[in-house]
């Protein structure tokens, strides 16, 4: 028997006379994706060694030797000198092999006492994910800050607000840009909330029933920066709701980015003409020399579907698994790893795109009153004069009909035409028949009036900075 047992590169084997068939080994192998957990595995092993020593299961010399070996192994993993071999089943088996190669089987073989791959991988996955979501959150906040900077640069620019993609009411461009920051800020808050639930360590739960060796799960939890250890060992080793929760928030970020990306695509068309994309954040055509394509936005739309697919695939994997651990859970990591990787590609590109958008404010101002976007202002002006809204709504609609028949805007109707629709429509109504007047009148909290948008911008920046403290 070799120093590594009857099944080198795996953490099992004594029950078996020989190793697995080649097809079985290929099916079981996970080092091609779980190697990203290697630094966390080494760190957790160092904590585990100290707990074994505290419990009297590892002598002083063996502890020193083991920690020295783990330190050298960590350095070799970081440098790329130590990598999985073809025989390694997973990251855990590879690292145990690496440790034994450095300190020998007598010392290296003691590390496995009191822990199972079941509690080990559940812990490492949480550790990795807690770090990963902070990186993602920081990237989301970069997008938020880019939007806020653009909003601050265009404090009085106006544009047509839309519902159903049809002209609705005029709004400030800054108000529209900030509307994209709020869902993204909520996404970061969701990641922060997720972290509270993820900060519970499964370590010490063993395969499913806990440990009989007098180990201290709370000590390991504290050393690995968890808030506490798990209360139920079965739940700790078999639950992956933390992964599903993270996958949902990552997918939601993709959805929120895709909504903004769709607008960038539309706004950059000649039909809209709101924006010009920077050369650095667009591409050309292999046959049409005039093209300037919004590939960042289109890839964002596409990758948002991928993130949703990762979420639904993970949920399908988790569905109907009996307690406790099942090998199905080998499939839990790749969807989440991929979602994080896709967002780490997307977020810097979206930030660069937003930061360099050139807004054509004259074009937006020209279109702001188009489509009779001031009709609601007529109705609400009448309400302020004491006219019931039902009547006011009818009168405003009649004004639209008259203007449409003449081929003019509402602001071009004569005093006689307005009075002919409703005597209450005196010349004073013209105070709201301008885009600027309409916007200024919407000064309730959350409205598009400049004073409210300025307050909102300050709040967005303050919240973004506060959330960055958590990311660090």
From Swiss-Prot:
GO terms for cellular component: cytosol. It is found in: Cytoplasm. The keyword Amino-acid biosynthesis applies. GO terms for biological process: arginine biosynthetic process via ornithine; L-arginine biosynthetic process. Keywords: Amino-acid biosynthesis, Arginine biosynthesis, Cytoplasm, Lyase. GO terms for molecular function: argininosuccinate lyase activity. The gene is argH. This is Argininosuccinate lyase. It comes from the Bacteria. The keyword Lyase applies.
């Amino acid at each position: 028997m070799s120093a590594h047992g009857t099944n080198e590169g795996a953490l099992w084997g004594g029950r078996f006379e020989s190793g697995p068939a080649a097809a079985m080994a290929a099916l079981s192998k996970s080092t091609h994706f779980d190697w990203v957990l290697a630094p966390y595995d080494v760190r957790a092993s160092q904590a585990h060694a100290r707990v074994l020593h505290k419990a009297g299961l590892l002598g002083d010399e063996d502890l020193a030797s083991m920690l020295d070996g783990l330190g050298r192994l960590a350095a070799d993993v970081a440098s790329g000198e130590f990598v999985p071999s073809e025989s390694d089943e997973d990251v855990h088996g590879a690292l145990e092999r690496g440790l034994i190669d450095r300190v020998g089987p007598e010392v290296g073989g003691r590390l496995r006492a009191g822990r199972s791959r079941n509690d080990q991988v559940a812990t490492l996955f949480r550790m990795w994910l807690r770090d990963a979501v902070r990186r993602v959150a920081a990237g989301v906040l970069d997008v938020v800050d880019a939007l806020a900077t653009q909003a601050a640069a265009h404090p009085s620019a106006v544009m047509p607000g839309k519902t159903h993609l049809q002209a609705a009411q005029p709004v400030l461009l800054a108000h529209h840009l900030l509307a994209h920051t709020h869902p993204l800020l909520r996404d970061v808050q969701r990641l922060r909330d997720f972290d509270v639930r993820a900060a519970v360590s499964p370590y010490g739960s063993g395969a499913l029933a806990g440990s009989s060796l007098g180990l201290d799960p709370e000590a390991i939890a504290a050393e690995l920066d968890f808030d506490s250890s798990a209360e139920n060992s079965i739940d700790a080793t078999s639950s992956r709701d933390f992964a599903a929760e993270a996958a949902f928030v990552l997918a939601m970020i993709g959805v929120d980015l895709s909504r903004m990306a769709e607008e960038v695509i539309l706004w950059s068309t000649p039909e809209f003409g709101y924006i010009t994309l920077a050369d650095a954040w667009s591409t050309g055509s292999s046959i049409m020399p005039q093209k300037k394509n919004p590939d960042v936005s289109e890839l964002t739309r596409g990758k948002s579907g991928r993130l949703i697919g990762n979420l639904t695939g993970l949920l399908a994997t988790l569905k109907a698994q009996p307690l406790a651990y099942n090998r199905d859970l080998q499939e839990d990591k790749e969807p989440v790893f991929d979602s994080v990787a896709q967002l780490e590609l997307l977020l810097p590109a979206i930030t660069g795109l937003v930061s360099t958008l050139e807004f054509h404010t004259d074009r937006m101002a020209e279109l702001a009153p188009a489509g009779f976007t001031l009709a609601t202002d007529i109705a609400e002006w009448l309400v302020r004069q004491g006219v019931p809204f039902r009547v006011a709504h009818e009168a405003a609609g009649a004004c639209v009909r008259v203007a449409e028949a003449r081929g003019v805007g509402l602001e071009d109707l004569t005093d006689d035409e307005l009075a002919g629709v409703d005597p209450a429509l005196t010349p004073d109504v013209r105070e709201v028949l301008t885009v600027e007047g309409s916007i200024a009148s919407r000064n309730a909290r959350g409205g598009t009036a400049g004073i409210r948008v300025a307050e909102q911008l300050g709040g967005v920046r303050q919240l973004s900075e506060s959330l960055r403290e958590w990311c660090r």
